[in-house]
């Protein structure tokens, strides 16, 4: 297991080459966290991803519908793998490319792609400079990870109304993302036992 940042340096270069060539497979790693580290995610991003994964699992365990808990766990862990390349809105698109190169299943790649905010419409995607398509979470697992991500800032967990106020500060009170987040909250609250 890699512990020091200087110990990872040779591995990071090797992983970068293997990612570009498409020959890497995550079976070579002892854990999913090592995949994040090898992909180049900072310790802050890794800590955030762990927190989101834990929050998402907590949500999944508290609902009265059947979901794939392992997919939720891994989706929470890998949702921000694209932040190894960019911290901009394009990190989801970058994460999709990384996930595909790593051989992630489509269900996991979809979580990475659709986790931004409470989802992004095709119209908003174009405005943000993303490829024109909907980035709206569709499956329960996608919605749970997206929602959990919205409730975690760094590693600090927030309640819905605190997160909503934060969204309003960042996006403005009339942004379509606010309505999507409120709708997402009500949908997930409806699943809770």
Describe the function of each predicted region.
Residues 172-193:
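Charged phosphate-binding loop/patch that engages nucleotide di/tri-phosphates or the phosphate backbone
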Residues 39-40, 115, 171, 185:
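Alpha-helix boundary/capping residues
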């Amino acid at each position: 297991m890699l512990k020091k940042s200087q110990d990872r340096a040779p591995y990071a270069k090797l992983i970068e080459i293997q990612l570009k060539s498409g020959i890497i497979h995550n079976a070579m790693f002892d854990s999913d966290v090592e995949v994040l580290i090898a992909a180049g995610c900072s310790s802050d991003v890794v800590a955030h991803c762990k927190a989101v994964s834990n929050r998402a699992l907590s949500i999944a365990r508290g609902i009265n519908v059947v979901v794939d808990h392992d997919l939720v766990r891994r989706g929470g862990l890998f949702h921000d793998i694209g932040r190894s390349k960019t911290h901009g809105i394009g990190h989801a698109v970058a994460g999709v490319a990384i996930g595909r190169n790593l051989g992630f299943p489509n269900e996991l790649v979809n979580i990475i792609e659709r986790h931004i905010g409470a989802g992004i419409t095709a119209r908003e995607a174009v405005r943000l400079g993303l490829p024109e398509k909907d980035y709206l979470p569709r499956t329960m697992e996608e919605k749970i990870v997206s929602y959990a991500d919205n409730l975690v800032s760094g590693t600090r967990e927030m309640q819905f109304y605190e997160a909503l106020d934060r969204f309003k500060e960042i996006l403005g009170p009339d942004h379509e993302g606010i309505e999507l987040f409120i709708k997402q909250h009500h949908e997930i609250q409806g699943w809770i036992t």
